[in-house]
């Protein structure tokens, strides 16, 4: 009897309070009234748009807006602001920590992949919407005028998040990061107001979106200075038969060559339980590449270099991988993984630091049951375009570092990610970072690490630029509407 009475009381309370709409109901009603297209919860489109790339980190949005115009984006933002619902923009959805969803439940997610226009002007500038995926950007710039942008190699990655937080790829040392080629942008602010920014217009906002772009609003169009697509570009790889004794010196020699290598070379060291290998790209023909690589090949002891010269789209296709669609435009694009990743942007390492790293790889790494891998890119060096700007020139701060590591471990899509994977990836990173001085290293915002807390994350991603970013945040988003667990907070 007491149970029944309590049940009736609870039902009465529920009935009494249900007249007050929840934030979810309120924001969805607002979107409907504003005629903003949305995904109905439980629909096929909700399932497609609402399934995170990283299956380890699923989050449930309060609503999914699917705009096709800037006016609809503006109206959606106004709805989120009106009802106090945090907002996150999702371009391609490839965030390692599901930041397109907000990195937590309950956000208004603005799905931008229906906005993927690429327009090349006669003067070589391009206006591109954030939902354009990198392979589509490359294809359109090539088809419209044999032009190109510096960007990453995965064709399904959306331009928005990629360009607004860095954008490292196979011609970065010659042309810079994707954000280095940005000359302007159109942004929907937290009020719904649409503004333009460049070096001469809202310059503080333009500074902030080049490295920390998710923190201030929804960037609905990006403007770039493109370059003529190389007529000849050569991709290459170098097989290495190293062991625990020879790898430290080999890695050190690779680094030392990288310090002064020509800007035309962009290359990376791959490391896994299977060993070590180099791959990269050279702007030019095979004969010129082999001449440029000769000092490194001699250091490596006469290793075999495999090289192929292609045109720009040949390079894009090669690094996309076999059987991958290099021009994805479908809203039902469906790529997923179940993984944990981290990163390290580091100065030049000593031989002792490489020994520490190799010891970890050869013991804990090799004995692990995990299928981990890592990449060590030489992003800097005397002739690198990435290193030319000062750390304070853009919100992207890692201009003085030489190396960029990406650490990655994945399991089957249906598996529960095992807790020892976190320690493995952390151990790989700390085998290097533990001996580095504070302030000399950081982490890359496009390889976000879900296991670090907010203040530490902002310090790692944006370093000496955090204070200025907090001031810009306070000016443009004082109520912290655009937020996630690792975002910039408004300066008090």
UniProtKB/Swiss-Prot annotation:
<dbReference type="InterPro" id="IPR016169">
    <property type="entry name" value="FAD-bd_PCMH_sub2"/>
</dbReference>
<dbReference type="InterPro" id="IPR036318">
    <property type="entry name" value="FAD-bd_PCMH-like_sf"/>
</dbReference>
<feature type="cross-link" description="6-(S-cysteinyl)-8alpha-(pros-histidyl)-FAD (His-Cys)">
    <location>
        <begin position="94"/>
        <end position="154"/>
    </location>
</feature>
<dbReference type="InterPro" id="IPR012951">
    <property type="entry name" value="BBE"/>
</dbReference>
<dbReference type="InterPro" id="IPR006094">
    <property type="entry name" value="Oxid_FAD_bind_N"/>
</dbReference>
<dbReference type="GO" id="GO:0071949">
    <property type="term" value="F:FAD binding"/>
</dbReference>
<dbReference type="Pfam" id="PF08031">
    <property type="entry name" value="BBE"/>
</dbReference>
<feature type="domain" description="FAD-binding PCMH-type">
    <location>
        <begin position="57"/>
        <end position="229"/>
    </location>
</feature>
<feature type="signal peptide">
    <location>
        <begin position="1"/>
        <end position="19"/>
    </location>
</feature>
<dbReference type="GO" id="GO:0005576">
    <property type="term" value="C:extracellular region"/>
</dbReference>
<keyword id="KW-0274">FAD</keyword>
<comment type="function">
    <text>Catalyzes the selective oxidation of C1 hydroxyl moieties on chitooligosaccharides with concomitant reduction of molecular oxygen to hydrogen peroxide. This results in the formation of the corresponding lactones, which typically undergo spontaneous hydrolysis. Chitooligosaccharides are homo- or heterooligomers of N-acetylglucosamine (GlcNAc) and D-glucosamine which are linked through beta-1,4-glycosidic bonds. For optimal substrate binding at least 2 GlcNAc units are needed, and chitooligosaccharide oxidase is most efficient on chitobiose, chitotriose and chitotetraose.</text>
</comment>
<dbReference type="InterPro" id="IPR050416">
    <property type="entry name" value="FAD-linked_Oxidoreductase"/>
</dbReference>
<dbReference type="GO" id="GO:0016491">
    <property type="term" value="F:oxidoreductase activity"/>
</dbReference>
<comment type="similarity">
    <text>Belongs to the oxygen-dependent FAD-linked oxidoreductase family.</text>
</comment>
<keyword id="KW-0285">Flavoprotein</keyword>
<keyword id="KW-0732">Signal</keyword>
<protein>
    <recommendedName>
        <fullName>Chitooligosaccharide oxidase</fullName>
        <ecNumber>1.1.3.-</ecNumber>
    </recommendedName>
</protein>
<keyword id="KW-0964">Secreted</keyword>
<keyword id="KW-0560">Oxidoreductase</keyword>
<dbReference type="Pfam" id="PF01565">
    <property type="entry name" value="FAD_binding_4"/>
</dbReference>
<dbReference type="InterPro" id="IPR016166">
    <property type="entry name" value="FAD-bd_PCMH"/>
</dbReference>
